[in-house]
Amino acid sequence: MDNLKRKHHRALVQVFFFILINYIYIDRELSLGKNLIPLLNEYAIKTISPIQGVEYFYTFITKEVFTRDFLFPSLIIMSTVCILGIFFGPVLCGWVCPLGSFQDLLSRLGQKLFKDKYDNFIKPTLDKNLRFLRMISLLIVLSALIFKITDVGKYDPAKAMYNIFVGKFETAGLIVLLITTVLSLFIRRPYCRYLCPYGALVGYSNLIRIFTIRRNPDKCSGCNKCNEACPMKLYPGKEQQTRDVQCISCLECTSEQQCPHEKALDFSVKIGKKTIKMPFSVLFAIVLCIVLGAILITSTFAYWPFLKESLY
């Protein structure tokens, strides 16, 4: 029973942020001004969108916009993304991103429709080659920003998804969103796996993250349950440690989720001979508190009028 409850932790976080982020966009676009949730605006949310997130990183690093209302929120957001990445990898992708949550929801429908055939329509060799498109996508977005092509955000499917709720439709982003929707019925997280530039950027945190997915060969029976559970179709059951840049730190493969063998696969850090495990419930609380706290603090700075003056 306890294990069943644990399986819902990530889903609860995903639903919470999906509703929260869409509310923020709706409130901004329709200017509701009702302050149902005080001190919230779109400043912090831009780092979660696939293309806008890369734009935000680029703008912060190059200081293209250097005003106080941008600087302070940016410092908080960048610190949050980096700290979470260094400790846990791209948990924003696996736990917070609304577009990722939307694809996860569609994957459940796809699994019911196609059963064992789901996510097995593409041959492994082709799947491996298609994953390079994600890096190409990142390079295209960065090139567009360098050459001052300012409308690159119109291709962002997450932005298109938010805008649907307020009756705004950008053709380019909507087309990408529709393609993602259809493909999600056949493939798990197709946009995350093959095209997301933001995922390509933050995915490199897997190479340096302190806590990582570790397999205990003595406990592992090779049942393949962990590999089947991975939404990015990685193979944690074949590795001593999972440091693939496509891992989204969802922990669906671990012994607390899908693996039937206790301590066979966990999220931990090894210090000398001692292994410190990160329980699923603790990561649940950390992600929820840190991300929500960053949004609240960021929005507080953005709401202070005197911080909107230019630094120069």
Language-model features: where?
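Non-ligating segments of multi-cofactor redox enzymes
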Residues: 1-228, 232, 236-239, 245, ...
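Short, solvent-exposed linear patches
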Residues: 250-252
